[in-house]
């Protein structure tokens, strides 16, 4: 029996006041609908039907490379009408799971519980109890069993008092779903084809209906405007921060970090305020991350330290390596064990060897730097000739004086010393001292120019 997921994503989202389709608005740098798609993959969906309408070009540009079946809902005539657009891709033996593109916080564990609650050939609906259920469809029960769902605008006074509400998420057998969708009517207060009406049909047909509930009501909250979007963002961040703390991270203030990807942490990780994680970030044990640091798609080994306001992107820090404050590691940069870069040092496609250091104000690009190397302040690897990049190789135990330019391609041999202010254009042999600056002159009796008064 295949799991066929239908995601409703056709709405415009007028209250967002945006040209962007509502489901493309982001939570943690990822569109709401992408969160839902990813969760569908997590539970082992065999197929995903995306019912779309407004903003088709933008949706396809954002999601087009994924394995989705695109089902157009040309007119928005209700949730039942939306699901009906997916019928051509639904087999009778499928279990159909209906999700919503603007409900991004639904968790895989909740959907797995819902699917487990569905009886053989029966229906399972996800419900939640709210102290204030205003605006939501109510779950109508008789002797404890679900017999229907009534929408707010169609409910009587007794039904309005019910606090168990419909989330819209449900699991339904494919064959029965097709039958029930064919019976839907728009004879209601909103003139729409309600998906919720199939629950009363299921009851009338003697089909067993079970319910499940999420761990938290926030999982089933949608975003219709930017205020609600911001509320979902905060809820998502709080949930992800809690995961990090449970895994072994000490967050100085859990409300002042941003997690925009997949973060894995070891034990005793210290994270100061205003740190941002993006993409896939892997952090070892006993790592310290200073305030305002940004970590993007990087790997940080045990005992490493990232000092405040450093940016680590597509890079690696080895055991006990340190970067910052105000350091920048760009893609392809790597600090080996005990290596250090300080403030205003930038690296790209460069390796700084074991125990080597660049304390301040340097650019190291397209460089292979050995162990025990000292890079003086103001050092630049001149790697670009206007058309191509070239490699600089600095072997072990080299001392590079301040304000040195290394014009690539160039190799500096082991133990060499480069005098401050030198411009190196040729290879340097092992243990050589190279000084290329102009000889210092002393002129006695020098008179400074005097400004002429007008």
From Swiss-Prot:
Main localization category: cytoplasm
Entry-linked NCBIfam families: glmU, PRK09451.1
SUPFAM superfamilies, per the entry: Nucleotide-diphospho-sugar transferases, Trimeric LpxA-like enzymes
Subcellular location: Cytoplasm
Start and end residues of each stretch annotated as N-acetyltransferase: 248-454
Protein name, UniProt field: Bifunctional protein GlmU
Positions with a binding annotation for Mg(2+): 102, 224
Family classification: In the N-terminal section; belongs to the N-acetylglucosamine-1-phosphate uridyltransferase family. In the C-terminal section; belongs to the transferase hexapeptide repeat family.
Region (Pyrophosphorylase): 1-226
């Amino acid at each position: 029996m295949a799991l066929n997921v239908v995601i409703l994503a056709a709405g415009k989202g007028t209250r967002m006041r945006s040209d962007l389709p509502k489901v493309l608005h982001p939570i943690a740098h990822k569109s709401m609908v992408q969160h839902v798609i990813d969760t569908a993959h997590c539970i082992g969906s065999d197929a995903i039907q995306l019912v779309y309408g407004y903003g088709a070009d933008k949706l396809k540009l954002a999601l087009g490379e994924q394995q989705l079946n695109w089902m157009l809902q040309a007119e928005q005539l209700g949730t039942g009408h939306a699901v009906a657009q997916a019928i051509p891709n639904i087999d009778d033996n499928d279990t159909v799971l209906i999700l919503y593109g603007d409900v991004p916080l639904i968790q895989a564990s909740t959907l797995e519980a819902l699917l487990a609650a569905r009886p053989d050939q029966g229906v399972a609906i996800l419900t939640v109890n709210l102290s204030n259920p205003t605006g939501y469809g109510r779950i109508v029960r008789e002797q404890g069993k679900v017999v229907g769902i009534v929408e707010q605008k169609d409910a009587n006074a007794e039904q309005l008092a019910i606090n168990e509400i419909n989330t819209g998420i449900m699991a339904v057998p494919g064959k029965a779903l097709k039958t029930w969708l064919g019976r839907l009517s728009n004879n209601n207060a909103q003139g729409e084809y309600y998906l919720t009406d199939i629950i009363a049909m299921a009851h009338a047909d003697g089909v067993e209906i079970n319910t499940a509930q999420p761990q938290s009501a926030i999982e089933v909250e949608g975003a219709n405007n930017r205020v609600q979007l911001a509320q979902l963002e905060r809820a998502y961040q709080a949930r992800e921060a809690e995961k990090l703390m449970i895994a072994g991270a000490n967050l100085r203030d859990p409300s002042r970090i941003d997690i925009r990807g997949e973060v894995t942490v070891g034990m005793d990780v210290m994270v100061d305020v205003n740190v941002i994680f993006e993409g896939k970030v892997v952090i070892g044990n006993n790592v310290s991350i200073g305030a305002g640091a940004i970590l993007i798609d990087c790997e940080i080994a045990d005992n490493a330290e990232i000092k405040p306001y450093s940016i680590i992107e597509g890079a690696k820090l080895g055991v006990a390596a340190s970067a910052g404050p105000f350091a920048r590691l760009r893609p392809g940069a790597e600090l080996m064990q005990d290596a250090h870069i300080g403030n205003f040092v930038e690296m790209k496609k460069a390796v700084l060897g074991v125990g080597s250091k660049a304390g301040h104000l340097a650019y190291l690009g397209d460089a292979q730097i050995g162990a025990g190397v000292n890079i003086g302040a103001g050092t630049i690897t001149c790697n670009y000739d206007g058309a191509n990049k070239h490699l600089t190789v600095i072997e072990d135990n080299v001392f590079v004086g301040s304000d040195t330019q290394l014009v690539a391609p160039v190799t500096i041999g082991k133990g060499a010393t480069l005098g401050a202010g030198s411009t190196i254009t040729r290879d340097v042999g092992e243990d050589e001292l190279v000084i290329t600056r102009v000889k210092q002159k002393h002129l006695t009796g020098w008179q400074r120019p005097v400004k002429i008064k007008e």
